[in-house]
Structure formats: structure tokens, C-alpha cells
Amino acid sequence: EEHVMKKTETEKVQLIGAIGSPYTRKMVSLLRYRAIPYKITWGQPEVILPAMGLELPKPLLLPTFLFPDESGGMKAVTDSTPIIRRLEAMSPERSVLPGDPALAFIDYLLEDFGDEWVTKYMFHYRWHFETDADNAGTLLPLSYGVNLPSDMLKQVKTMATERQVSRLYVVGSNDTTAPIIDASFRRFLQAMEAHLEAQPYLLGSRPGAGDFALFGQLTQLVGVEPTSRAIAHELSPRTVMWTSVM
């Protein structure tokens, strides 16, 4: 997928990502809003980078950006928060970082909240409940190719679902914490519903980095996972539509 915005091919920001990755969705939306030319390769960086002769970044995350290094080659870089700051230094137009220091700090906290806490909602609702896990197990492999043969889809679904369900502990999701995570998600939606009645973005009339962080997670919570989608439609239709607007 290529987006040409009056710039040459060599000036495009390159990245590798996945439709089911909330951080990929966060950064693609940010690039589009900031009108930064980009070229995205949909796939797995652990497969794509070696084929390009590039070293894997540490840690290996989605999305993976490719930036020029000191030698004139390309280097794989991850972690969306510092990448946002790097992009600001490269292109200051349509900034997503508030100029006021106090607002900038609040925006940073909101971005961190989205990246580190709202992602717990996403992973919990994606894999904790059997219906949701079955849904994600089917859809996520297809995001890499809707023409995936049925027998291969079945194999990948089983492997991916077992692996991800076994990793629920990483975000602190289990039968004991499930009601706590659910209650937190519902409070978040209620707060968003009240807030969006007053203004269209978290800090005013245009989005900051925090908006894009929340958006990334909500693309999955509102758009993919059946349980969280139903809760969102019930408690905060404004958040549902805000996710589409973003």
C-alpha cells in the first residue's frame, strides 16, 4: 500500500506492520494525519527484514520503521513513542505534540495510558473469552492474506490461538482479574462518552499523540473483538464513531 503526497519515492517513510496490530494502526493514522509520505509493507518483520539483509531490531515490535543510518543504509527501528518524536524532528508541520509544556505532559501520559493500559483491555478481550479467541484466531491470519488456503488457515489458527491464550498472563489477564479489567474498560468508555460530548479530541480541537495511541487500541476493541465491541456500542457510541473519524 503506497501513499504519494507530492514527494519522491526515496523520501517516503518506510514501515512494516499488520492490520491486527494496534500500534501499526496508531502510526499509520498518525502518518496520514500529518501528511507524511509513507510506504507500508504488510507482514512480519522477522521474515521481511532478513530478506532485505537488515538486522532485526531489539525489541522486535510492530510496526517496524526503516530509517537511514549513519552509513547511508537503512536501520530497523521500533517503539512508537520515540518514533513520533523522531518524525516531529523530520517534519514539523501538523504536529501532534502540544506546544504548551503542561499540555505536552498530559498528552504524554495519555499516550502512555493508551499504549500500556488500554492495550490490556485489547489483549484481554481478544483472547480471554472463547468466542473472542475463536474470532481473532480466524481473522488475524487472514489479515496477512485473505486467500490463505483453508487447511493452512486451520493450522495457523490453532497455533496462534494456543500461543496467545498462553500469554494472557503477560497483561495480567486471568479469571481473577477479568472483572477488574472489564470494570476499568467500562469506566474508560463512560469517561470518553462524557468527554467527547464537550470536544472532539482529548485535548481540544485537534488530535495529539494520546489520541492516536487510544485510536490504535480501539480499532481492535471496537472493530474486531465481539465482546468489547458490544460493550462499546452500548456505553459509548461517541467513542465508536470517534474511532472511525480518527
Task: Show the residue positions of the predicted features.
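Short secondary-structure boundary/capping segments
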Residues: 1, 55, 227-231
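GST-like domain detector, emphasizing the conserved glutathione-binding G-site
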Residues: 4-151, 202
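GST-like fold's C-terminal all-alpha helical module
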Residues: 120-245
